[in-house]
């Protein structure tokens, strides 16, 4: 085969993916869709440029336009999140966490994080960035009923362990974490308080969910492509939480510690997204939470076992469903079936699942942020719940449901809460 044919195949698969994705109901909680303006930035000549260090203090020449964009980004991010510092250089949420662990921790230091089954991210784990730094990883006591950290037991743990770092936030995140309650206790023992906002950054930007930096967090790490609807990347936001030497260690850990060049085309996309969120973020975040609640309620009415009923099911973009009663393989059975019907989400461990069940966990994790951005509202959430019922409860042929999903999704092809299309109009 001629090498040009490989190029043609790659372009073909990209085109097919984009066509397929535009006609599916994407409910992956860790994904979103970027606006045409952000796409323009990501596809720009910034992708060819290299920059190391701070704006106007680079180790490379030719950065004058890149510097202007990054300085705009620092201004917008600090305004959006009311932080003293904003570092746009991390290239992912994991990269941001890695920098924090390396900058603030030493091998042997103790860190408290969520357990994987309770929603902790892999970068927090002994086998992830925390463990690679040599940190001694402990996990928060968790209350399955409230689907949250057990505050009383956590207070006791902090005082007994005297950790160097405590981490709030995670990947399974329907309810705010008790930052306000536990941050003062952590600071009593000299711990740094870190909040991993990867999943909820867009909600925080829009004034929903919680406000970690006002509730006691020193540092907020995040990815920029979930509820914050930018290109894949990361960010670190923080207050003047320590002396200059400690803050310099964190900054040094970012560069030259865990990255050199910081993917300038993605950086530019983050900056435009921050501007979009300053303009539209409040409306977007509010609708995300409304849609998540509407979907949870509709799924419960259809007969699904939705987690968190006593607390209104969710306060974030996520809806958690226990499907273990429907099939022995739980989410490992449900997610592929739904994919056949054009409904894309992921299987997920629930707090009572052992890690050995990772491929056949009890749960499904659902996120509504992308479907919200293409203009869907509460009524559409009811339709999505019914599609899921047809596949998983009624055992209807997924291929038949796929046809209905295709035509349903066809009506939602614009990216709202953006300068390109503004706000969606509710009929």
UniProtKB/Swiss-Prot annotation:
It is an enzyme of class 2 (transferase). GO terms for biological process: glycine biosynthetic process from serine; tetrahydrofolate interconversion. SUPFAM superfamilies: PLP-dependent transferases. Its cofactor is pyridoxal 5'-phosphate. It comes from Pyrococcus abyssi (strain GE5 / Orsay). It is found in: Cytoplasm. One of its GO terms (molecular function) is glycine hydroxymethyltransferase activity. This is Serine hydroxymethyltransferase. It comes from the Archaea. Keywords: Amino-acid biosynthesis, Cytoplasm, One-carbon metabolism, Pyridoxal phosphate, Transferase. Catalyzes the reversible interconversion of serine and glycine with a modified folate serving as the one-carbon carrier. Also exhibits a pteridine-independent aldolase activity toward beta-hydroxyamino acids, producing glycine and aldehydes, via a retro-aldol mechanism.
